[in-house]
Amino acid sequence: MGCVLVNDRRILSTGYNGFPKSISDDLSRYNDRDFKISITVHAEKNAILNAAKNGTKVEGSTLYVTFPPCSQCASAVIQAGVATVVCPNPIFAPERWVESFLAASNLFCEAGVKVLYYSDADLCLTETAPSVEPTG
């Protein structure tokens, strides 16, 4: 999972899913799913934190991400003042994330953050919010 924050065609910051700085990321920790999930810093938050650490303002920027933001990352994106999010359409995501993606979509809508969804198949941008329903 990766993320790039851009403004005026200039890269402001990048981030990726990973353990916090100085925390060992040996294979046994990645294989313990509960532990991994509990400490992983998502790409969006890493990009925002990296920008803050470097004194880079991200307000009004566009966030490009390789996976739809979860509700926690959506909150951070909104709080940082990001104006636009470009991400894959969540209808193609694993079912376990659907609830969080729906919450994120609602948060973005309420906060006025523009979201452009794309599909890997055609990489066409659209402003139509996805219709995501759990399957199975």
Regions found by a protein language model. Name each.
Residues 1-136:
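Zinc-dependent deaminase catalytic domain
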